[in-house]
Regions:
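N-terminal/domain-start alpha-helical segments
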Residues: 1-95
Length: 95
C-alpha cells in the first residue's frame, strides 16, 4: 500500500509541483487549498505525512498543526516563505 501524504498549500503551482513529484515517487496524495479543508481531509484521509503551509486561508498552518497535535503525532513538515527565527522555533515547539 502506498504511503499517504496530505499537501496543505494554497499556492496551486507549489501544490501541483509537490503532488507531481510525490506521485512520481509512488506516494498517494491529496491537496487541501486552505486550513479548514486540510483538517477535513486529514481526518478522512489519515495521511502518513503532512506538508503544511503556514500561511493558509481560513485557518493558518499553526492552527491546523495545533488541532492535529491535540490527538495525533503524524509527522508534519511546515512549509513557508517566512524566514524569521520565531517561525522556526514555533514550528519546532509545536512538534
Amino acid at each position: 500500500m502506498a504511503r499517504k501524504v496530505l499537501i496543505a498549500e494554497d499556492d496551486n503551482n507549489i501544490a501541483e509541483l509537490l503532488n507531481l513529484y510525490l506521485r512520481k515517487e509512488g506516494y498517494d496524495t491529496l491537496i487541501a487549498p486552505d486550513g479548514g479543508k486540510a483538517l477535513e481531509v486529514y481526518r478522512s484521509f489519515r495521511p502518513d505525512l503532512v506538508l503544511l503551509d503556514i500561511m493558509l486561508p481560513v485557518m493558518d498552518g499553526w492552527a491546523v498543526c495545533g488541532k492535529i497535535r491535540e490527538t495525533d503525532k503524524t509527522p508534519i513538515i511546515m512549509l513557508t516563505a517566512k524566514g524569521e527565527t520565531i517561525d522556526k522555533v514555533t514550528g519546532l515547539e509545536m512538534g
